């Protein structure tokens, strides 16, 4: 992958945690104690366990903190897409991916302090997604921009 495309990739932290009260608090407290800010997260339930996916301001450090705390943790390459916080913005992104035959595996979104909507996505072909989004003049944020949010 060429260097310019690598800079568009965000490292997402994923971890498995028991689906019981207090587990999210435990994870969040570990990150808080390490001075790591959670920018966005989602939880997917899977029976007795859940998958917590999050983007943070210090992904490598977060990975190490959680791993050494005994969590099963991994890093995943995702994209951060800046959208207008208006009806139809999600539809446009979905259409762009559909027309390019890029499968959207999962997504979660949040709104920044300055009222920009950001969509975090995992796709089946990240290089094709970057190329397609850039051709459509859709802004991708990188880790440095994410850290400032």
Question: Model features per residue range: what roles?
Answer:
Residues 1-149:
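A conserved regulatory-domain signal marking ACT and ACT-like small-molecule sensing domains
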């Amino acid at each position: 992958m060429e260097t310019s495309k690598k800079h568009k990739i965000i490292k997402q932290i994923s971890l498995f945690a028991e689906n019981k009260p207090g587990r999210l608090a435990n994870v969040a407290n570990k990150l808080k104690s390490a001075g790591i800010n959670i920018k966005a997260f989602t939880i997917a339930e899977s029976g007795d366990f859940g998958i917590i996916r999050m983007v943070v301001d210090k992904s490598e450090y977060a990975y190490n903190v959680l791993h050494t705390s005994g969590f099963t943790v991994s890093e995943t390459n995702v994209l951060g897409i800046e959208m207008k916080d208006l009806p139809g913005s999600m539809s446009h992104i979905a259409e762009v991916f559909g027309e390019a035959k890029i499968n959207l595996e999962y997504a979660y979104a949040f709104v920044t302090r300055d009222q920009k909507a950001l969509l975090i996505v995992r796709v089946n072909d990240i290089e094709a997604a970057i190329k397609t989004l850039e051709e459509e003049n859709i802004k991708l944020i990188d880790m440095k921009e994410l850290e400032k949010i």
